[in-house]
Amino acid sequence: MNQLRLEPIKKVSGTINIPGSKSISNRALLLATLASGTTTLTNLLDSDDIRYMLASLKQLGVSYRLSNNNTVCELDGLAGPLNAGEPQTLFLGNAGTAMRPLCAALTLGQGQFTLTGEPRMEERPIGDLVDALRQLGAEVSYLKNEGFPPLNITSTGLNGGNVEIAGDLSSQFLTALLMVAPLAKGDVNIKIKGELVSKPYIDITLALMAQFGVEVQNNDYASFVIKAGQRYVSPGKVLVEGDASSASYFLAAGAIQGGEVKVTGVGKLSIQGDVKFADVLEQMGADIEWGDDYIIARQAKLKAVDLDMNHIPDAAMTIATAALFATGTTRIRNIYNWRIKETDRLAAMATELRKVGAIVDEGHDYISVTPPAKLNTAAIDTYNDHRMAMCFSMMAFADCGITINEPECTSKTFPDYFNQFNALAN
C-alpha cells in the first residue's frame, strides 16, 4: 500500500491555478460531440474521469486532437447523435460524470451499447435516470442488479413527451436528461419529483447548453420544458473554468494556516455553485477577497457553523476537516447524497475524523464535528475517493501531521494535488 506522510506545516502562502472543472469538462465534451462544427476546449481537466469519457467517444467514432498536456481538445462534432454499426462495450471506471450522461446520450441514435465500470460503479444508483429514459421510449436493461450498472442499451432514438424524474438523489440524472432532450423526436416536459438536490450543478448544465445554442424553460426548478427541433451548434471555443471543488482545499488552507492563498480560475463570474464554499469560510471567520476570476483566503480565528450544505455537497466535505481547526461544533446538514458518491462519504468521513480524535455524530443526512483539545496523528484510509485524500491533507496544519493511505486516488480529478499542496508550504 502506498502511503504519503505530511509533516506539520506552520504556514502556507502562494497562488494556485486550479485545474479544469470535472463537471464542466465532461458536459462540454458531450455537447461538443452532439453539436455541429469543431469545438476547441481549453483548460480541460486531465484526469481519470475525463480520460474515460474521451476513450468512449473515440471508440464511438468521434474525432478529436489533444494537446501534449491533455488540457486543450479540438473536437469535431457529429451534428447529431452517437451511432454504432456494431455492438459496443464501454468501460467507464468510477466516472459518474461519464456514465450518467452517456447512458442518456446513447439512447438518441441507433445501436447496441453496454456500459460497465469498476465494482464501486455497480453500487452507484442509476435507476431514476433509466426510469425517466424509459418513459421517453428508451430500451435500457440491467445486466446485474436492478437500478445499477452495468447497463445494456438498444437505441432507436428518443421520443418526446412528459417525463417525471426524482430530484432528491443526484442532480446528474437531471443533467443527463436535459442534455439529450433537445435531440428527442418531440418536445420534452420534465417534472421533478421531490426536492432537487445540488441545484447549482443544474445551473452549470443550463449555462453550457445555452453556450451551444439550446434554450431550456426552467420553471423554478420544479419543471423544465425543452422544445424539439433545436440543434447544438459549436460556439467555437469553450474555456473550462477551474474546478471550484478543488479550489476548496487551498482556500481552507489559507483560512487555517495562511499567509495568503490565492486561487485563480474561479471567482465572481464562475458558473459553479461550489464557489459558495468561500462564503462558508467567511461565515467561519476567514478573511476572503473575491475577484472576477480569483478568490483569496487569509488566516483568521475560525468558529463553528451549522449550515444546510445541499447546494455545495462536494466542497462541504472540506468544511468537515476544516472544522477540526474551528472552535465549537460544526454541523453540516442535508447531505444525504454523500452516501452515493465515490464511497459512502458520510460513513467514511465520520470514521476517519474519529481517528484523529474528533467527536463525531453521523446521522442519516448530516454530520457534526467537534475538535478535540489536541488532534492526534493517524493513517487515513481514502476509500479510493479523491476527496477523502484531499480533505485530510488539512491535518498537516495540526502539530502532529498526518499519513494518507493510497494518495494516488486524487488522479480522479487532481493528479498533481499533493505537489501543489506542498508547494504552498515552501
Swiss-Prot record:
Write down the top EC class of this protein: transferase
Q: Keyword Cytoplasm, does the record have it?
A: yes
Binding of 3-phosphoshikimate, residues: 22-23, 27, 170-172, 198, 314, 337, 341
Ligand binding (phosphoenolpyruvate): 22, 96, 124, 172, 345, 387, 412
GO cellular component terms listed in the entry, alphabetical order: cytoplasm
**Record keyword rRNA-binding present:** no
- PANTHER family for the chain: AROM/DEHYDROQUINATE SYNTHASE, PENTAFUNCTIONAL AROM POLYPEPTIDE
| Quaternary state and interactors | Monomer.
Q: What is the recorded name of this protein?
A: 3-phosphoshikimate 1-carboxyvinyltransferase
Q: Which organism is it from?
A: Shewanella halifaxensis (strain HAW-EB4)
